UniProtKB/Swiss-Prot annotation:
Protein function: Catalyzes the hydrolytic deamination of adenosine and 2-deoxyadenosine.
Sites annotated Important for catalytic activity: 221
Source species taxonomy: Bacteria, Pseudomonadati, Pseudomonadota, Gammaproteobacteria, Enterobacterales
Gene Ontology molecular function terms on file: 2'-deoxyadenosine deaminase activity; adenosine deaminase activity; zinc ion binding
Gene: add
GO cellular component: cytosol
Keyword field: Hydrolase, Metal-binding, Nucleotide metabolism, Zinc
UniProt-recorded name of the protein: Adenosine deaminase
Catalytic activity: adenosine + H2O + H(+) = inosine + NH4(+); 2'-deoxyadenosine + H2O + H(+) = 2'-deoxyinosine + NH4(+)
Record EC number: 3.5.4.4
Amino acid sequence: MIDSSLPLTDIHRHLDGNIRAQTILDLGREFNIALPATTLDTLRPHVQVTSLEPDLVSFLAKLDWGVKVLASLEACRRVAYENVEDAARNGLHYVELRFSPRYMAMTHRLPVDGVVEAVIAGVQEGCRDFQVDARLIGILSRTFGEAACQEELAALLAHREGITALDLAGDELGFPGTLFRNHFNQARDAGWHITVHAGEAAGPESIWQAIRELGAERIGHGVKAVEDPALMDYLAEHRIGIESCLTSNVQTSTVASLAQHPLKQFLEHGVLASLNTDDPAVQGVDIIHEYTVAAPAAGLSREQIRQAQINGLTLAFLGEQEKAALIQRVAKG
């Protein structure tokens, strides 16, 4: 189902949600951190979804184990580097890795600024070694509140040349986007692109807020957009992208099943929607699974899957010359 003549992208992929089980085991041993299991096989059910039944609480608990072992800046550099290696192994030509430096720093009270620097270094090394084009998106974890997000933003801005865009993630219901207008004004002043998690837990009004108040060019998940016909029209007309994550949305109970996922509706409506993974190490999937298993199960035709692949490049936070160069590189094999 993947068109090998086109670049394969993943533009919604959490770096801190893609920490290998083996790495969690290694770092746990290195720093004498108590883990729920002591071998890879017994650890895996604690850090990766192994049940078909959606369970948000369990999903989040598995996600947290990855950052609980980040006890040094070198550990942060390592997982960033391995994220690029994983992208190369998955056959990705271009990947946007998003991360919350505060989330990565909090368990062991690492310097947030140092985490940003370590992640940038790891990704740059990975791009050099594995010939993958990767960009970084900084996340503000709104669950920590406005003041903490300003500190997180300051750490990202201190290394602005290594960051491509800003995202807002976390408790969408308790911390609406309007609280973070000033933060995103600063991001736009820095020349960054804007993408926002919205319409995942909250309704269409959260997506409108992300667009009108934060300047979102893309929306993460955005499944609730289908509840508002005017919003669907607006997304299509203004070419605001939807970063769809099929398997993730089922595992977190955002949608009831793949068959009920709105990605097909987005594509039929002319919305620029793309296929992405989200937290692949936790989900136990890769981008190939999303194209060959999840997308057909969501009702997408072969042509719609190809369109989603095209949309991934269209929506990428790259200049037109960079996109053209990527297309040419893939064509040459």
